[in-house]
Amino acid sequence: MRMLMVGAALVMMTSAAMTFGAMADDDDDAKGAQKLAMQGRDDYWHCLAREYSRDSNQGMSEQDFGRSVAGACPSERQYYRVALLDYLTAQYPNIDAGAHLATANRAVESAQKDIVTAFVKHRPPAK
């Protein structure tokens, strides 16, 4: 009987350790996904900043600059979108993937809108 209780205790401790290990792995995965999403965001923003500061943008209208920004940095934009999607999926696995994709797309659109807003606010006045 005593061996049975020791065996049961070992099974329970092993199960608890495995569950904790899985939770720690999930936490590590989420932290890694968050780090990649933040890196993707930073890379995309830096690329947009390079686009913003090009001399060829001088004299562009807001609409033309907006179109230029929308097509700029395709690899950085896609990496940011995918990394953010991965992070959201890891962080909120019970939410529909379509909702995560919509959120990632809104984040990309927001970055583009912010760059266009900065362009409009800081361009020299028309002569």
Write out the residue ranges for each language-model feature.
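Short N-proximal segments of mature Sec-exported proteins
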Residues: 32-83
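Compact alpha-helical subdomains of small soluble proteins
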Residues: 63-127
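Boundary at the C-terminal end of the N-terminal hydrophobic targeting segment
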Residues: 19-26
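Bacterial N-terminal signal peptides
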Residues: 7-17
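Positively charged n-region of N-terminal signal peptides that target proteins for export
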Residues: 1-4
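Charge-enriched, low-complexity helical/IDR scaffolding segments
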Residues: 24, 48, 107
